[in-house]
A protein has these predicted regions:
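Active-site helical microenvironments for divalent-metal-assisted chemistry
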Residues: 1-153
Length: 153
């Protein structure tokens, strides 16, 4: 697991495991807070788009980018690990499927690039404070590799 390998605390790791539960299950933040603790529930809440689910794709993603500008270090770490996992999967799928990869998303390649490069700007704006090889460096490098690969073809 990305957060564990990066040396984050147990609370951050647990929040990383639970980060999609509010969006994808019937579990509530109260349940998470009572079952685990309020710090984990707060991190999970910070990673959730649930309250914005009715907005169009681009508006939801713009909200995510704006929110992450002010989010706690823990929320930023969980979000970065989640997005790093997503981009790594996209890279692997791109190697197998090529341009067909983009057909499976609600938004096409250009919109995905806008979103992921926007996330890089927000999540990786403190790279000089991060050790080489951190999840933030890995995320930036993976996003650049995915979208540079596309442009080179």
């Amino acid at each position: 697991m990305i957060l564990s390998q990066a040396g984050y605390s147990e609370d951050v790791i647990v929040a990383g495991v639970l980060h999609d539960t509010i969006e994808d299950t019937d579990l509530t933040l109260d349940y998470i807070g009572n079952r685990f603790n309020t710090r984990i529930a707060d991190i999970v809440e910070g990673c959730s788009e649930e309250q914005h689910g009715t907005l169009p794709w681009k508006a939801r993603k713009q909200h995510t980018i704006e929110y992450l500008k002010k989010a706690s270090c823990e929320v930023r770490a969980v979000a970065c690990a989640d997005k790093l996992h997503n981009v790594r999967s996209m890279v692997a799928d791109y190697q197998e499927q090529g341009e067909r990869l983009w057909d499976r998303f609600n938004a096409g390649r250009d919109e995905q690039e806008w979103y992921y490069r926007g996330l890089v700007l927000v999540l990786c704006n403190r790279l000089n404070q991060e050790p080489a090889g951190s999840i933030f460096h890995q995320f930036k490098d993976t996003v650049e590799g995915l979208f540079s690969r596309h442009q080179a073809e």
